[in-house]
Amino acid sequence: MNDRKRAVRYGISFVILAVLLIFLFIWNVNSGSIHLSVQEILNIIFRHQGDEISYTIVWEIRLPRILSVIILGGALSVSGFLLQTFFNNPIAGPFVLGISSGAKLIVAFLMIFLLSRSVSIGSGAMILAAFAGSMISMGFVLLVAKKVHNMSMLVISGVMIGYICSAITDFVVTFADDSNIVNLHNWSLGSFSGMTWGNVRTMVVVVFLTMVIVFFMSKPISAYQLGETYAQNMGVNIKVFRILLILLSSILSACVTAFAGPISFVGIAVPHIAKSLLKTAKPLLVIPACFLGGAVFCLFCDLIARTVFAPTELSISSVTAVFGAPVVIYIMIRRQQRI
């Protein structure tokens, strides 16, 4: 009976996430200066029918942005889950540990260097630069983790690494041309605006391939959650496994930072929301729930960012912080009460 109840709960949870995703997808497509009926939206998406202005707005502007939000929101959430698993730390995440700031730093260097020479920047170059920055920051975090076993100190160290990277980024920006500063400033605040179908295709390839590998690692992750000794007894190569966790989480985080800039709290808050909804920590269930939850959370936050003070658009990172930070505070309070 318990197994049946759990199966029903899992099913209901995924249905809720799927319904929210569809609802927010339609709401986002319809939100903006031009409002369209659901039928008009469906005709444009599936039949490519509609007046020229509506078609251009939906197909060339809104759809690439919405799909980018779904893909990158899901990727960032899964990246946070992998980092929490690696460090066995409930508030580990790309933003808090300074990994996003490291990616931001290297991308800033690349943008200023190439834009000052009137050289366009491809999606692949941005992702590689962000990945390099993520790995550099992760290297520093791992060095600190070896010396410090206290959760609070690890988080503080990550925040300090983030501040250092941000300070260097600000220093670099002071020597950039005005036009380059505008491009970098808009990107560094965190935004899903300006996405193209080319960006979406690149995201799909990178995130899909990474997620396939993550799914295949569900069983080793499940064993690792029960302790390194147990995982070793189950045949998991701990060194290879830990390296893969770092690489996969960094790739997902780098992809997000390259296209949308640093986005806060999604990688921390959503995995805990997914676990609370499912009432389980099984990776085979939590990973897809994290992806769907991250997509839903970011769709909601992007909708707020675009519409609340329209035509002025808020930074997506500011909105995610407003809704994500309370979750982190709740996690820390609950953990303290258990001690």
Each language-model region and where it sits:
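Alpha-helical transmembrane segments in inner-membrane proteins
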Residues: M1-I339
